[in-house]
Amino acid sequence: MTSPAKSSTAASSSSQRSLSAWSPLGGERFYAAARWVLIILLGVVTQFLTNGGLWPVTDEIGPLEGIFWLYVGFALVFTVLAFLQFAAGLVSISYLFDIAFISLMTFFGGERIVIFFPLYLVPLTYAAIRQSRSVSLLSGLLAAVAYMAAFIAWRRLIAPEALMTLLDYVALALRGTTLAIVPWVTGNLAERQSEFNRERVTQAQRDAEQALSEARAYRDQMRSLYRVALTLGSTANYRQVLDTLLQESQKIVPYRAGIVLLSSGQPNELYVAFGSNLAPGDLNRSLKMDTGLAAALRANTAQVITSFTQFPSLQQLGSLRTCKAAALLPLQAGMRVYGLFVVATDQTLTTDQVEMLMALANYAIVALHNAQLIYDLKEEREKLLSHEEEVRHQLARDLHDGPAQAMAVITMKAEFIKRLLERDPAQALAELDELSSIAKRTNYEVRTMLFELRPLMLETQGLKVTLEQYLDRLRAKAGNTAIVLEGTDIDKVRLGSKVEGALFNMIQESVTNAIKHAKANHIWVRLRRLNDQMLEVVIQDDGVGFDKAAVLKSYERRGSFGLLNIDERARLVGGRAEIDSTPGKGTQITIFVPIES
């Protein structure tokens, strides 16, 4: 039993064979229909010329009527042949028979012979379209000769009494010339139009192929961007980020060399941190910042160059010496500049390629920024834990050196007074007075310590009043050092509770360090409202100062230094701190914190 699928396939094949058999005869079938229109016109003309003798058909029909009916029979036969594949060759020259029949009817048309002239245009137009230019020209000449011969033969053989004038000959020549050139002109016009149409079709195909190629390239680029986004979004390793950037850039722009320049840590210096297709010795090479590199790093968009003359630092790299063009893409996020991505090629870079490279670089910048934030967060966490541990140790030392020893003295004094009461009550009273003094002093020290840890009045009376009371307590410990508090336009300043507490701790640590280490005559604490968003606090002394670079190195070794922790704590509350110190010229610490709107 035949399956429906096989039956459908067989029917489709049969239909395709039928179409292939009919399709070559499309022009001939149309011309067969046009021939019947021509026959109708000839019938009307013949009926007019024979005064109604065309129909009904009798035994005494004239030659014009006979030729017409022969032509009708011819048309019937060739109409059938137009649908048969094997007769295609014969059908293609059937227009010659049309010319012959029209010429015979012209010969027998009598005085109205001119009326047959337009009917030649139907077969001649067919010849112009279906045949070559040379064949259509020969067909036109044949039709012209046949028409002129029929016209002259009728005048000479059938109507010799009708004399031809010069005007008749001129008119005949014009009609003959028209018949001769019409197919040639029509054929040329048709061929030129066909060539134009072919060119348009070819151009449309080229445009379609180009559009398809661009669509495929765009699809590949989107896939690359997706892969980059997926890879970069799942890693916090900046090395993997930059490796992915180099690999995916190679797919978009087959570059000669890809180079990532990062800061070396030295002023105005970069180094080759990563690269692809690098020349020997280029990796880790240090480059001084020239004018061109500085401008490229400051730019917000990619810079395309065709010469390295303005980039003497890049000329040192062997990887770039044979390259003709390069794209310089800054790797920056906000105010932070990570480095420069250089893509060097042997060919000119297109705008689309540069835009895609910039898109890849932007993905990499986001990943780099995230990696940096994660790194900074870990560093801040370690520093905060270290600072917390340091504060605990400091608190333990302060408690041990102050209240703990005082309590031990009080305990010993109390035991001594108990024994002394039995032997010398008067002396015991004196000892009780001293014990009371020690207890009061210890109570003051404990209160001061609690005040320094978290003054409750900070929440009720504000920063300035709290600082005034704190500095009053501190002046007793400061010896000959004068502590001056100044405030400018800060009465209505409101800070968040966390910001206010952090700022108090930063001021406290700065002043305490100045008292302990600066050996200063004066310490100034100045508060000033800069604008509606920022409060500035300056802690300045005229002490011995210190070498900031040396302290930084010491800080890196020890992992702890109070003054340098101030900037970290300021950034935690949305501010920043600046430390400026010179040996022999004192120290100035400037803290900026946000004002609560």
UniProtKB/Swiss-Prot annotation:
Record field: transmembrane: 37-57, 67-87, 109-129, 134-154, 162-182
EC numbers, comma separated: 2.7.13.-
Domain Histidine kinase: 393-597
EC primary class: transferase
Pfam families: GAF_3 (PF13492), HATPase_c (PF02518), HisKA_3 (PF07730)
Subcellular location: Cell membrane
Main location: membrane
Record-level Gene Ontology MF annotations: phosphorelay sensor kinase activity; protein dimerization activity; protein kinase activity
Keywords: Cell membrane, Kinase, Membrane, Transferase, Transmembrane, Transmembrane helix, Two-component regulatory system
Membrane topology: Multi-pass membrane protein
Keyword Aminoacyl-tRNA synthetase attributed: no
Cellular compartments per GO CC: plasma membrane
Listed InterPro entries: GAF, GAF-like_dom_sf, HATPase_C_sf, His_kinase_dom, Sensor_HK_TwoCompSys, Sig_transdc_His_kin_sub3_dim/P
PANTHER family: NITRATE/NITRITE SENSOR PROTEIN NARX-RELATED, SENSOR HISTIDINE KINASE NARS
Protein's UniProt name: Uncharacterized sensor-like histidine kinase Caur_0899
Taxonomic lineage from the root: Bacteria, Bacillati, Chloroflexota, Chloroflexia, Chloroflexales
